[in-house]
Amino acid sequence: YCDWSSDVCSSDLDLFAHQTNVDLQNHCICFNTVKLGKSMQSIGMMTVLDQIWNRITRNRVLGRRTWIFTDEFQLLLGNSACTNYYFELSSRARKWGAILTSITQHVRSVLNNEDARRMLSDCGYIKLLNQAPDDANDIARLLHISDEEKRYIENAEVGSGLLIADKVVVPFNNTFPQDTELFHLMDTNPNRKK
């Protein structure tokens, strides 16, 4: 028998039993759960999602929009409680003045999760970069992309892909000159980092 509440409040799992060092009044807040151990991932992500919902509700009262950017979205999908919470949040966010952006490099995780598939198919704006052939086929079926459009996300060059906005599909090429300072600031390729 384990008294979960006493473990979280007074053991080595008491991470959330103290005052936060995050300034929750700031206009821009970044939550990073990457350093949480496996035993704390679930409660950490649920705490973050709860804080996000609290901010959405406060901002709604104040007449403000809330922008939420979730990077490494696939990490939420590994926990059913987090997936369910995020799905509910995404279902209500727009009506509450929030704009939700979910980012992943692992689209297969999204395609393999029914709630995530529903979130993807309900999106008003989707940006797709290069995809593996099987993933591109599944995305094309889910989002009703033609074979002609699908070729823009199969073997696509870096910076190229498809934008889908309210069912309008537009191919794009956003290649950036590599000899600029701005390119080096934005570049995420570790092989090119100095």
Task: For the regions a language model picked out, list residue spans one by one.
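Short coil/turn segments at secondary-structure boundaries
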Residues: 14-22, 62, 152-156, 167
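GHKL/Histidine-kinase-like ATPase module
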Residues: 11-21, 26-28, 160-161, 171
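Short, solvent-exposed coil/turn segments
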Residues: 3, 24-26, 63, 121, ...
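Conserved P-loop NTPase motor cores
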Residues: 34-152, 178
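Conserved P-loop NTPase
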Residues: 143-193
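Single conserved hydrophobic/aromatic residue that forms the stacking wall/gate
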Residues: 1-8
